[in-house]
Swiss-Prot record:
Name under which the protein is recorded: Phenylalanine--tRNA ligase alpha subunit
Taxon lineage: Bacteria, Pseudomonadati, Chlorobiota, Chlorobiia, Chlorobiales
PROSITE patterns in UniProt: AA_TRNA_LIGASE_II (PS50862)
Assembly with partners or alone: Tetramer of two alpha and two beta subunits.
Cell compartment(s), UniProt: Cytoplasm
Gene: pheS
MF (Gene Ontology): ATP binding; magnesium ion binding; phenylalanine-tRNA ligase activity; tRNA binding
Length: 343
């Protein structure tokens, strides 16, 4: 009897279950009421009483082993069938359209700005967003008590108090111009795009972080007329040939004389509305002739060289071009808004 059990044990262990057909064959051969294991249980009555207990335990172990092999094989085949079903490609199903991203309106405008100015001969320069006060204020002719140096206007970074230098998030890209003038000799013709930071209340017209593009031209005999020609050429290419410009006297510590430039309102075409505060004009940039003190700070002789500088908000220009009435929409990443710029 023990020999028959050992023989059947080896037979069960060597039985290969590779399909549902062989699984059913295994069940019919060993596990049904008239199977091989059941037949051995029927022969248990012929075993001597002394051996019956031990033989019964062997038969129970054999039956448990066979049942476990059957269940494991059944689970494996079911899992394999499910996996194959998931991998089947139904060519009759409709295809899935891939989502196509689009260029952000600010990046579109910035790209156009770069293209316009590089066509005029300007090179592109960049600099760090984390700046020191020397480049952000001192060398730009900001007086020590200027409001822009206060914490309510600027994000200052607290480092080692022993350092003694002001470290801040730059409030404009003008520090890049300073670095260029310190590193290069005239003639200099560059634009400086990048992100800047202001400690301002967030509203439909202002944000605490925005994109700016500044320009600088230093050479002999540069005049305000050259500045106006550059601004006019840029505005016509950016906003269309019919756009009207207005130069207003202004003040900036780093330029003298200084001006602010307005264009006709994109919503009312100069008739007056709530966006332009009934004036018919919208400011796009500030500009002026580089102050002699700034040139001296950078080792450039103001008696020999002169130059102009200008700066504009890329985000505000995007609002003008695409007739968007809230700057916050440019930073919210709302797909419903961004989808409108998909090409």
């Amino acid at each position: 009897m023990k020999h028959s059990i050992d023989s059947l044990q080896k037979e069960i262990e060597s039985f290969a279950i590779t399909s549902n057909e062989t699984l059913e064959e295994f069940k019919l051969t060993y596990l049904v009421r008239k199977g091989s294991i059941a037949n051995l249980f029927k022969q248990l009555k012929d075993v001597s009483p002394d051996e019956r207990r031990a033989v019964g335990q062997l038969l129970n172990t054999l039956k448990t082993t066979a049942e476990k092999k059957y269940e494991d094989a059944k689970d494996t085949l079911a899992s394999s069938a499910a996996s194959e079903k998931n991998n089947i490609i139904d060519l009759t199903l409709p295809g899935r359209t891939h989502f196509l991203g689009s260029e952000h309106p600010v990046q579109k405008v910035l790209g156009d700005m770069k293209q316009i100015f590089t066509a005029m001969g300007f090179a592109i320069e960049t600099g760090p967003e984390l700046e020191c006060g020397v480049y952000n204020f001192d060398k730009l002719n900001f007086p020590p008590d200027h409001p822009a140096r206060d914490m309510q206007d600027t994000f200052f970074i607290k480092l080692d108090e022993k350092d003694g230098n002001d470290v801040l998030l730059r409030t404009h890209t003008s520090p890049v111009q300073i670095r260029v003038m310190l590193d290069q000799r005239p003639p200099i013709r560059v634009i400086c795009p990048g992100k800047v930071y202001r400690n301002e209340a967030i509203s439909s017209r202002s944000y605490c972080v925005f994109h700016q593009l500044e320009g600088l031209y230093i050479d002999k005999n540069v005049s305000f007329a050259d500045l106006k020609a550059t601004i006019y050429s840029f505005a016509k290419q950016m906003f269309g040939q019919d756009v009207q410009l207005r130069f207003r006297p202004s003040f900036f510590p780093f330029t003298e004389p200084s001006a602010e430039v307005d264009v006709t309102c994109y919503l009312c075409n100069g008739k007056g509305c709530k966006v332009c505060k009934q004036s018919g004009w919208l400011e796009i940039l500030g500009c002026g002739m580089v102050h002699p003190n700034v040139l001296c700070q950078c080792g450039i002789d103001p008696e020999e060289y002169s130059g102009y500088a200008f700066g504009m908000g890329v985000d505000r220009t995007a609002l003008l071009r695409y007739k968007i009435d809230d700057i916050r929409l440019l930073f919210e990443n709302d797909i419903r808004m961004l989808d409108q710029f998909m090409q």
